[in-house]
């Protein structure tokens, strides 16, 4: 959530920055609402002051034995009280309206983010590794998995529907090995604390990280949002429960940065992805991911973004998977992000790079929603932290890349060296 002061004192400048990411802020409506807010605020304060003064006069009149005057003033106070209640109600309703508008406004892009409308205008930063040249016809991961009997899409459709998977035998083990390797790397070498978190979260948590109210249709809910009562939602990413660890807390400066990682399933309705990536493991309703989260001081967050992205890159490098790093343009960034890097892994059967990790600096956007703060040494007033998150990595897509990049002419799949200790020493599957 943006600082409301920006919408009051720097409205035109804020609108211009939002326009860079394709968001049109209704400046005239906000300006009108702000004038109403000021007027109602002044009216409320004036009525409160009048009532306080009258109440004091009642006591003075009674002390002087002038009960008739006291009764007269008491009647005036009653009328003022009614007017004050009306003014407070009108102000509260107006503040709610302003809040509902603010909740739908995305984060401001950092000045270093390139301008652009969509993914076609993202800017490539670097590449690592060279795609292999194959002397046989390349198969995709679906064919490779079904040939070996390790990926069973038909059973998943029977059990649940489309965009689900059943894995068997060595393929299920490889999936587990990938996640275990990532967790070990991030906790043992990159300094993250492993977390086990709930997979069902409440609305406050989803509001805190920005999924609600704007993206409710992308979630799986335990009860429709229209029903009374508090429902729960399946997490779309571990970013939600892990980042919410600092909601409504004040962290000591000395304890920052906080670095946390979690391996969880993620659940997404893919409401806006009809017809996209309908084959295979690329876009699923349920998929596993190892998430990286950092909580930092404001002045440290941009350096932390570089570090966090580097941690995700290290996974790909150790798995010897060719990838490229891109910075997202203003029009392609997520709702809460100020700056985002995507890592895209080479997928041979598609002859292209596909996103496997998205690493973002949210700055204080989530922290303001969550009231996540820290206190500097020697200071009384706490400040908002900055929050960062990234995939380290998406397990299913990593498996796709391993299968397709490691495929052999006979249909077997070479296991990356760093995973073999998790696979009982096996060098190939399939």
Swiss-Prot record:
GO terms for biological process: selenocysteine biosynthetic process; seryl-tRNA aminoacylation. Pfam families: Seryl_tRNA_N, tRNA-synt_2b. Pathway: Aminoacyl-tRNA biosynthesis; selenocysteinyl-tRNA(Sec) biosynthesis; L-seryl-tRNA(Sec) from L-serine and tRNA(Sec): step 1/1. L-serine binds at residues 237-239, 291, 391. It comes from the Bacteria. The keyword Translocase does not apply. One of its GO terms (molecular function) is serine-tRNA ligase activity. Residues 47-58 have a biased composition (Polar residues). It is found in: Cytoplasm. Coiled coil: none annotated. GO terms for cellular component: cytoplasm. Its EC number is 6.1.1.11. It catalyses: tRNA(Ser) + L-serine + ATP = L-seryl-tRNA(Ser) + AMP + diphosphate + H(+); tRNA(Sec) + L-serine + ATP = L-seryl-tRNA(Sec) + AMP + diphosphate + H(+). Residues 46-67 are annotated as: Disordered. The keyword Transit peptide does not apply. Keywords: Aminoacyl-tRNA synthetase, ATP-binding, Cytoplasm, Ligase, Nucleotide-binding, Protein biosynthesis. ATP binds at residues 268-270, 355-358. Consists of two distinct domains, a catalytic core and a N-terminal extension that is involved in tRNA binding. Catalyzes the attachment of serine to tRNA(Ser). Is also able to aminoacylate tRNA(Sec) with serine, to form the misacylated tRNA L-seryl-tRNA(Sec), which will be further converted into selenocysteinyl-tRNA(Sec). Belongs to the class-II aminoacyl-tRNA synthetase family. Type-1 seryl-tRNA synthetase subfamily. Homodimer. The tRNA molecule binds across the dimer. NCBIfam families: serS. This is Serine--tRNA ligase.
